[in-house]
Amino acid sequence: MTAYLAPSSTPTELEAGSLVAVIGSGAMGSGIAQVAASAGHQVILFDTRFDAAAKAIAAIGNVFARLVEKGRMTALDADAAKGRLRVAAALADVRDCALVVEAIVEDLEVKRSLFAELETVVSDTCILATNTSSISVTAIGAELRRPQRLVGMHFFNPVPLMALVEVVSGLATEQHVADTVFATAARWGKNPVHAKSTPGFIVNRVARPFYAEALRLLSEQAADPATLDAIMREAGGFRMGPFELMDLIGHDVNFSVTRSVHQAYFGDPRFTPSVLQQEMVNAGFLGRKTGRGFYRYGDDDVKPAPQAEAAQPRPDAVSTGPGAADPVFDALRQRLAGAGFSVGATPGGALEHAAPSFHCNGAQVFLTDGRSATERANALDHADTVLFDLALDYAGATRIALARADGCSDEAYKAVLGLFQAAGFTVSRIDDVPGMVVMRTVAMLANEAADAVNQGVCSAAAVDIAMQKGVNYPRGPLAWTDSIGVAQVVTFLSNLASSYGEDRYRVSPLLRRKLASNSVKARFHA
C-alpha cells in the first residue's frame, strides 16, 4: 500500500529568513502571508490587482496591532513581522523565493496557467505549493516541466486560527518536497498531516457523513433540526450541530462540495448528495448569508428550542441484564450508580456475546446497534424495548436521545424516561430510525476514516488529527472507534446496511480486517 504517511527521513524546514511568496491576497492568501511573516519569513504578496495586495498588507498590520493590544504579541515583534511583508509589482518579483504558495480561484486551468508562468520565473529549487481544497494536485502539476516540486499546502480558514495544514502529494510529488513543506508548516505553529491527492483529501472526504446522515435523519423525520443539533452538541460533544454548521458554511458551498466528491468517486453511494439540501439551494435558503437556512436569521427571529420530554417520576429500581462487558454501557452504568441506582457490574460468562442491557419496570434498554427499536423488540419478542444513543462522555453529557419500539407501552417508556432524567439527562425522543443520531454519525465517520487509511490516503494518526484540528471534532473518528470497540462498530454498520439494504453503509474492509485479526483487542491506536 503506497501512502504519504510520514516524513521518510528527518525533514528540513525552510530557514526562517528565507523568502516566501503568496499568490492571491484574499482571505486565504492574506492569512497565509500573516502566518509566514509571523514565523520570520520575508513575504512577498502578489495579486493581479496591486491595490488589493497593498490593502491586504495594511489589514494584516491592523491584525498585528490588535494582537499587541490584547497582549498576544509584543510591539517589537509586530513591527518586525509587518516589516517583512511587501507587495510584488509583477510576478517576476518572486524569482528568488524558496517557496511560492498559490491561493487563487478554485479553477484547474487558471491554476495550471499560473504555475506554468511561475516555472519560467523561479529557480529549479523553489517549491511550488497550491492551497487548493478540492482540485487534484496531480492534475494541477500534470503540464509542468518539473511536477515533482508541486505539492498541496491546504490551509483552513481563518488561517491564523486554524491549526491544520493538509500536505498533499500528487503522483509526481517528490517525498522530500512534501517533507520540507510538512516541517515548515510545523515550524509555523501548525499541525500538518500528510495526504495523498484524492478527492476531498482527508477532511472534505471524511466529513461528508456528518452532514449526510443528519440530512437523511431529517428527511426520515427522526427529529427536527434544532433537536438533532442539540443531540450532536450535548451528547456527541461537537461544537456545532450539522444544521447549524451547514447554515454557517452556506448550503450552496456545502452541497457543491458533496456533489463534487460524489462525482469524483464515480457515484459512490457513500457520498450521494441530499435531495433535501438541493431543494434548500433551489429555494435560495443558503443559510446565514441569505437570512434563512434550516434556521431563520432575521432580527426578530428566535431559534427554536430542541424537543425535550416532560419530567417523569424516578423509577424504583433498575437492574442489568446478562451480557458481555461493554465500555460504553459500563460508562452509563456508572452514571446511574452515581445517581443512586443500585446497578451491579455487567456479568459475562456463558452469555459473553449477548448485548448488555438495563431492565426497568418491564422495559429492556439497550445501546443502539444499528437496528431500530422495533426490529430489536421483534427479535427479542419483547415489545417494551427502548434504545439509547451514544454519547462522547456519559459522565458529562447533558442530553441523551431515546427511541422506543412501536409496541412499547407508555408505562414502560415513562419508566425509562424517569431513569435517564434522574441521572441528570435532558431526554430527546427521536422517531424509531435505525442507528439513532450520534452513533450513526460517528460510525459512518469512522467507516470513511478507515477507508481513507485502507486506500493509502493517510495514516490513522493523520486522519484523527485532521478531523480534530480541521473541523474541531471532539475526538478523532478512529480514536472513537477504539473507545467504542471495533467489534461494536462493525456490528452496528452491518445492521445499518441490513436495515437500509444500501451499499452506502457497507463496512470498510479495514474495519473487518481489524476485527478478524483480534476481535477483542483490535485498535487503531496503541
Residue map of PLM features:
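NAD(P)-dependent Rossmann-like dehydrogenase/reductase catalytic/cofactor-binding core
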Residues: 2-15, 41, 190-197, 209, ...
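Glycine-rich Rossmann-fold phosphate-binding loop(s) that bind the pyrophosphate
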Residues: 25-26
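N-terminal Rossmann-fold NAD(P) dinucleotide-binding loop
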Residues: 29-30
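Aromatic pocket-lining residues of Rossmann-like dinucleotide-binding sites
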Residues: 36
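Conserved acidic E/D residue at the C-terminus of a beta-strand in Rossmann-like folds
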Residues: 45-50
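Rossmann-like NAD(P)-binding element
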Residues: 51-52, 66-128, 135-136, 337, ...
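A short helix-to-beta-strand connector/capping loop
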Residues: 73-86, 148-149, 190, 383, ...
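Rossmann-fold NAD(P)-binding glycine/threonine-rich loop
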Residues: 112-164, 169-183, 359-413
